[in-house]
């Protein structure tokens, strides 16, 4: 019998997660033999595709759900600070690769777009002002501005102001140095960098159909989507970074840590505008508050998008429900993911989240006119003929066991790894791509602890001069790292492009 091909690492899925981890591992140890396996015929074809996500460089600057308000009125800014520092870690990696000289222009994947929060009504205004006062005290948010002056808002977001009632009580905050990120372009840059490296392959139209233990590693069964042929690869480490498909693959591995996890797929839709006369009037990402009873991923926002050099506007998201785990997945994905170990948590979540289910169904049933009503809260003069509906990527929210409720629905990301560190999977969604680098560093520390503390420590320090905890507490270092990243990524205020968008 022919011997299986052997590699050090197999990464499943050619999206932002696998591409980041693969390039990072190659930087830490250029001798590693890596293989990326992707079922689609190109990279970044699912959630990393620029039109399958909002492209917000999530840094806690404008996302109001990152600063939740408790029943007593207090506001917690910890999550916003943490995500801000995580994004700064991502920017350190991109800046490092750009400065190396073989990564091309950063402007191909990241562009300066101001981040704004916008609220209506006395309650909303009170919340935003309190949030601003708290965030402003932290060095990461020192440049944030607040206004209730409609003339100032007209300057910040001119498309959104005409047609409003004169007595409407509104407020906004603005951070000029926000970003729009084309995660598809970034992913493909990383994959090209990987493909140009020795002992690294990216294989498309190849689907993982089996995972079985092989001593201290894994045997990965891979099927050719086109020919139907199959091969087996032995790997010391396997990463499941396949977006919505990560859960079924994790279940396939059979590791004890996978027991009890389920998935709740949520689809998304956007309204998109390419009319240059309208697009030029809005150069910002403006986030507001989710409707009462709506889930956190439904926070509405009106965004500038820069994709392949072309600027468009995007509004949404409008949520929906399907049983597919991927946009190009199967309607059987959800039913086939049910196991004896997760049926309890899944039923508990179904019982406790009837409001969410009703919300998703109502979103699916919306007419174009109803969708435009939501848009007109932001842009009162919006006309149907300027906007078209786009289907976004799938997000599989995590269902996990809970000792009290039986099961809970978790919004966010979760890294699940085998006890021996030989396999890891990334489950969940937001803030996702923006904090990829932080999550992959956590994976490296968890699955390669000896190397992270030993042979790889110096290189990690070179790539990442400051990590999240230090960035959160050392103001001078934060500002230095941030300025260095701005310069390397062509986001400094002195750059012509930065001036154009700010």
From Swiss-Prot:
Its EC number is 1.1.5.4. The keyword Oxidoreductase applies. InterPro entries: FAD/NAD-bd_sf (IPR036188), MQO (IPR006231). GO terms for biological process: tricarboxylic acid cycle. Pfam families: Mqo (PF06039). It catalyses: (S)-malate + a quinone = a quinol + oxaloacetate. Keywords: FAD, Flavoprotein, Oxidoreductase, Tricarboxylic acid cycle. Pathway: Carbohydrate metabolism; tricarboxylic acid cycle; oxaloacetate from (S)-malate (quinone route): step 1/1. Its cofactor is FAD. It comes from the Bacteria. SUPFAM superfamilies: FAD/NAD(P)-binding domain. GO terms for molecular function: 2-hydroxyglutarate dehydrogenase activity; L-malate dehydrogenase (quinone) activity. Belongs to the MQO family. This is Probable malate:quinone oxidoreductase 1. It comes from Pseudomonas putida (strain ATCC 47054 / DSM 6125 / CFBP 8728 / NCIMB 11950 / KT2440). The lineage of its organism: Bacteria, Pseudomonadati, Pseudomonadota, Gammaproteobacteria, Pseudomonadales.
